[in-house]
Amino acid sequence: MTLEKPLTVMQLLPKLSIGGVERGTVQIADALSKRGHRSIVVCESGPLERDLRETGSEFFNWPIGRKHALTIQYARKIRNLCLSEKVDIVHARSRLPAWLGRLALSKIKKEKCPVWITTVHGPYSVSAYSKVMMSGDKIIAISNYIRDYITKNYPGVENDRIITIPRGVDEATHNLEFSVEQ
């Protein structure tokens, strides 16, 4: 598939800590940049910020993962950023950032509204709070197990909205040779 114009993709997550969500965010940012697309990441700074910046991604150090009453203000900021930067896709990778993203997008006219993607990284508690992760135009499940979790616990989610994209290990950055002694 050839795109007529480069995409602008915004990823939302709590913080650039060291973990699978965060590492995946940096990898997606890198892949987007290498393919000529524009990557924007919105989250609180953390140990992977330098890695993210090396991808050429734009970084907004906003604490959108803090469970605090004032965090709601970031929904307006995300909305304004989507409009000013002409974001094509918003990809939420965690529940609180997803709530902020969903609220932000609900205030954008349909013709200017980015595509809404969520990734379910684990079997969250089944609750109204977690249900936001099922609100994506497309929902990425990181394994068949997670896909089954979604279909079992959220029967209203249409199967054609769920895409399974298994996580993997980059052998170039991880030593896969080990022994029992290690």
Q: Where on the chain are the PLM-derived regions?
A:
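Membrane-interface segments of envelope glycosyltransferases acting on lipid-linked substrates or membrane lipids
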Residues: 1-182
